[in-house]
């Protein structure tokens, strides 16, 4: 979220205590530099007995309630002390940080159940497409005529499930500026509507954060939370929420650069949103790593980016791959045979062999990657013309860079290493999409018609067919 300063408020343990003038403190809240700060210019919060009695095991105050200068109801969640300074006897200045700042026109439970979350993500307008289309024409008198046409629907449902729905909602605002001009604003946001009330923390953890990762995965850049609000259970009053979510990336990302946009998603052969949110923990971990690498790839040191891309590829190689090469009985037979063969060797050698045997029932990196490439069919045939050369180089680079072999690392040209690393990320991206149910042709289409096309062209050039 962007930095913002909020109105000064009176704070207490609950709204009733403030109305009774009990245990009040005056303080201002600001969201700045990635932190949500409560600044108490005169007084201390965490040295009061009535406060310390409310602290949890982590010395965190679960909630603080307030009224601001405009008479609105405010609340802070999960407050921790940062600094406490005494400028003169009795003149204490305290600074605290919090996880959430909430504000509404009526009283609410800051950790209670809600029936709706509404979120605006960065780059969402480009991803979702405009609600308006404009037609320009020139009259015989030389005047420009503009005709605006709205799309038929005000919203598009991304997911309909037993728990509720996820919808992209469009909005158009019109405001006259002067007698000769008109300002028209076009925007979009995402609604999470719950059929049964859910607790706020669960809604953030189970729906908002995973969907944000899905959007980042589709956009190829961070889908940051710019605005957030909720509708508590039992009231129609909206609660606005501020929190130190990562700030939006600077500059626009145009939809032709994005791997998967909303219009493509609506025509996919499988319900990709549902498959992503419903994936098992192992695949979800790979999905989240891919989303974070897509966001950070341009700012990382090349060797570190390669290792994280290689880790992602290895996660996909191990996904649903059989864990054991041999049955327990066959493994025991082989181990007994080897042990009997080395029984006459000195103890140090025997111990070394026995330690190696404990790791002898897994699959090596080369075998796992070979099986993965075979399973990805036409996508890999198109992306990597020479799979043998790619596998050999990738395993060699991974071993050298993992163990920080300086002599080996120096052999790799930085541009080649960067092109290989980005290609591995695209390969892993395609593997995830195929595991989520898309066809090879759909994945190839995504790569060809997004910013991945440039990466794929360089990657294919590294490993041309013989």
Feature annotation, model-predicted:
Residues 250-466:
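Amphipathic, oligomerization/interface secondary-structure segments
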